[in-house]
């Protein structure tokens, strides 16, 4: 996988209360990913970017909410979320990967 595709697959970490609990208790990390990304692409991107061994990748599609605007109803974009499970003894460090 080329370096350009790695940065297009992983859009960034998803920070929420549930994602923080998963990271603290189970060592799982949540990322926003491209909607066309596959589990294998996500696994390779995380392994190459953070130099860790990924055990499992779980993905889910999040549907955008309908919101009212001044001009009527609008809809937020759909997006894809990936939960990354690392092998035992592995940990992600977001600060050291920004080289």
UniProtKB/Swiss-Prot annotation:
GO terms for cellular component: ribonucleoprotein complex; ribosome. Keywords: Ribonucleoprotein, Ribosomal protein, RNA-binding, rRNA-binding. The keyword ATP-binding does not apply. One of its GO terms (molecular function) is structural constituent of ribosome. One of its GO terms (biological process) is translation. Gene3D superfamilies: 3.30.70.330. InterPro entries: Nucleotide-bd_a/b_plait_sf, Ribosomal_uL23-like, Ribosomal_uL23/eL15/eS24_sf. Transmembrane segments: none annotated. Part of the 50S ribosomal subunit. Contacts protein L29, and trigger factor when it is bound to the ribosome. One of the early assembly proteins it binds 23S rRNA. One of the proteins that surrounds the polypeptide exit tunnel on the outside of the ribosome. Forms the main docking site for trigger factor binding to the ribosome. Belongs to the universal ribosomal protein uL23 family. This is Large ribosomal subunit protein uL23. It comes from Pseudomonas savastanoi pv. phaseolicola (strain 1448A / Race 6). The lineage of its organism: Bacteria, Pseudomonadati, Pseudomonadota, Gammaproteobacteria, Pseudomonadales.
